[in-house]
Regions:
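A composition-driven surface/loop motif
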Residues: 1-424
Length: 424
């Protein structure tokens, strides 16, 4: 309890072994990191935990910088780092909202982040299980080097370069609303803990920042890319098994350097209105086996599932404007779904329960009808692997990182449980 106001030229509050906020009102204005724990020789320490209270952080560096884990389980947390998203990513230094080397876990509370750099950044894995998170970023909204699990939190990214990025991404529950100037969700990164640590070490030793995102190229004759963008399936995984996911992207909507799998939930993608990016893009296998998917994008780059097994899907070259009403009906005239697009579009991909590949469906845009046969149209993903199913590596467990094991629900990933309240 109580009130603390701190204004510092460098770091605000620093706990060598750990730092826990259990209540009260804390306001920090710092030239460096606002909250920090940097114990680097004991895996059970070096964490920052926010259990309760009202915490307001304004920092020139990172809002929260934890050497091991950053855990938020309650309270109201507001972070402005590096001048906020409007300032853009700094040319030197780090100005992330929440940064941790091992795990970031959000399992409650209300968190608001306005960051010049990544809003949430883990060099290992992260899990967003409950609570409300609102973020604006000058770079990535939510970024992890290896695994990201979203299994219940309400996550809104209003501004970002890429809204959600990591090697192994699983969304199984919650409400996820993402806006980006490039890819909305990008499965690009490491798929093992060891590879993630190596990537971080290489990045730290390299003074030149490298964009690891695979660029989608305009397709040339024969389905091959014009230019140097890699189409290789490198094993990343983007998996949606539940929840409500909405993506508004100027680059690819859902993009995986490996496989893309949707088996349940409600997924809406507003992709680019023009250019050679698409609503759905994967270098490996793409499948829609359940749930409801509606995706709007340009007709210049249309990728569709690599399999016709399971739930049916249609891809229709239907054109509309921002605000157009799109209705999908079956052969008997029954309405399967009605949607309003936020952007101009030249193609619609749709799938929902009860659709059968080989059957005929109608996609109507403001009353203009286009017929499409389910399971046909567009191009299969995985251009770098012969236009056929790719998919490398096993499926990550539903709700946990694919390689490194499940992070504890609310405790540090490497060490012991942080105290529920300050000791002593």
């Amino acid at each position: 309890s109580g009130t603390i106001n701190a204004t510092t030229a460098d770091d605000g509050l620093r706990g060598k072994d750990s730092l826990t906020i259990a209540g009260g009102t804390l306001t920090v204005n710092s030239g460096g990191d606002a909250l920090k724990s940097d114990q680097d020789n004991d895996d059970t320490k070096g964490y920052v935990s926010i259990v309760d209270g009202t915490v307001t952080l304004t920092s020139g560096g990172d809002g929260i910088d934890a050497y091991t884990d950053a855990i938020v389980t309650g309270g109201t947390l507001s972070i402005t780092s590096g001048g906020g998203a409007s300032a853009g990513k700094p040319s030197t230094g780090s100005a992330k909202g929440i940064k941790a080397q091992t795990y970031i876990i959000v399992d409650g509370g209300v968190t608001t982040i306005d960051a010049g750099d990544d809003a949430i950044h883990s060099n290992g894995a992260l899990r967003l299980s409950s609570g409300t998170i609102s973020a604006a970023s000058g770079d990535d909204g939510v970024h992890t080097e290896v695994a990201a699990v979203l299994d219940g939190a309400t996550v809104t990214v209003t501004q970002s370069n890429e809204a959600l990025e990591g090697g192994l991404i699983t969304i199984s529950d919650g409400t996820v609303d993402l806006t980006s100037s490039d890819d909305g969700i990008n499965a690009s990164g490491s798929i093992t803990v060891e590879a993630g640590l190596a990537a971080v070490a290489e990045s730290s030793s390299d003074s030149t920042t490298t964009d690891t995102t695979t660029t989608t190229q305009q397709m040339g004759p024969g389905g091959m890319a014009d230019g140097g963008g890699s189409m290789e399936d490198t094993g990343e995984q983007l998996t949606i098994t539940g929840g409500t996911v909405t993506v508004n992207a100027n680059g690819d909507g859902l993009d995986s350097n490996g496989s893309l799998t949707i088996s349940s939930g409600k997924t809406t993608v507003y992709g680019p209105a023009s250019g050679a990016n698409g609503a759905l893009d994967s270098n490996g296998a793409m499948s829609i086996t359940g749930g409801t998917v509606i995706a709007f994008a340009t007709n210049e780059m249309v990728e569709t599932p690599t399999t016709t097994d399971g739930q049916g899907w249609v891809s229709a070259a239907a054109t509309g404007s921002a605000g157009s009403t799109v209705t999908i009906t079956d052969s008997s005239g029954s309405v399967l779904g009605t949607y309003t697009s936020l952007k101009a579009f030249g193609n619609v991909i749709y799938s929902t329960s009860g659709m059968t590949n080989g059957s005929t469906y109608t996609v109507s845009v403001d009353g203009t009808a286009t017929e499409a046969t389910a399971g046909q149209g567009g191009m299969g993903s995985g251009m770098g692997s012969g236009m056929g199913p790719g998919g490398q590596g096993g499926q990550p467990p539903a709700g946990g990182p694919g390689q490194g094991g499940q992070p504890p629900a609310g405790g540090p990933g490497q060490g012991g449980q942080p105290p529920a309240a300050p000791q002593g």
